[in-house]
Amino acid sequence: MKKVLLLLACTIACVYGENYCAMNSTAQTSCLISGSVCALCFEGGDLVWHLANWNFSWSVILIVFITVLQYGRPQFSWFVYGVKMLIMWLLWPIVLALTIFNAYSEYEVSRYVMFGFSVAGAIVTFILWIMYFVRSIQLYRRTKSWWSFNPETNAILCVSALGRSYVLPLEGVPTGVTLTLLSGNLYAEGFKIAGGMNIDNLPKYVMVALPSRTIVYTLVGKQLKASSATGWAYYVKSKAGDYSTDARTDTLSEHEKLLHMV
């Protein structure tokens, strides 16, 4: 195992040269993949100094990242979820700034190969960032929901009931949608989306909005107990098109609401 670590450290030092193998002596500053030279670089270079002095800090940072990634969901903690979203929103501009700075620094020292890679990385990052905004704006145009700008949101479930529109972000397009009514509380995908409802308030259809289209799910079956306002309703795909999930007025008929174009 030690030999593997030495070989890995030597490889890193060979790639980055003076950055990771700046020796205090007058010896060469680049590593060769040989036993003695590599060991000398690993034991005396800046890499070991960095790990020895910053290993605890990196451990704390990685623990925070693991916690945010694993428990950054609304059902666990809204605070951790907010931290996760903040990190995801900041990553694009930070990466873009780093690639631009690296391109400038590489150009200053005439390392044109690395300059080319840095420019390519900056271009790819910028394109991906623009694509995120385009898809988010398209989704917001259909749903009028700020969940559209959630980096994890690929689709949004829209349910109209009691004269209001309720939304729930989804990671993908479901085959069918089940709405569950428990003691007057309406649940979708395990999340409570509305309260104070009865069996007469369940909609005839629900919608799932994507950046490119809106999918309509029609009610095909339900089982309800009126006395306790408890039951379920199941919806399946019926059509897709350029529909808006936001009905402007309550005076529209069900058919008019469905055909209300964006």
From Swiss-Prot:
GO molecular function, one term: structural constituent of virion
Gene Ontology cellular component list: host cell Golgi membrane; membrane; viral envelope; virion membrane
Residue ranges annotated as Virion surface topological domain: 19-47, 99-112
Keyword DNA repair: no
Domain of life: Viruses
Main location: virion
Keywords: Glycoprotein, Host Golgi apparatus, Host membrane, Membrane, Transmembrane, Transmembrane helix, Viral envelope protein, Viral matrix protein, Virion
Compartment list: Virion membrane; Host Golgi apparatus membrane
Transmembrane region(s): 48-68, 78-98, 113-133
Stretches for region Interaction with N protein: 237-252
InterPro entries (alphabetical): ALPHA_CORONA_M (IPR042551), M_CoV (IPR002574)
Bilayer disposition of the protein: Multi-pass membrane protein
Pfam families given in the database record: CoV_M
Topological domain spans for side Intravirion: 69-77, 134-262
Subunit comment: Homomultimer. Interacts with envelope E protein in the budding compartment of the host cell, which is located between endoplasmic reticulum and the Golgi complex. Forms a complex with HE and S proteins. Interacts with nucleocapsid N protein. This interaction probably participates in RNA packaging into the virus.
Family: Belongs to the alphacoronaviruses M protein family.
Free-text function comment from the UniProt entry: Component of the viral envelope that plays a central role in virus morphogenesis and assembly via its interactions with other viral proteins.
Name of this chain's protein: Membrane protein
Gene name in the database record: M
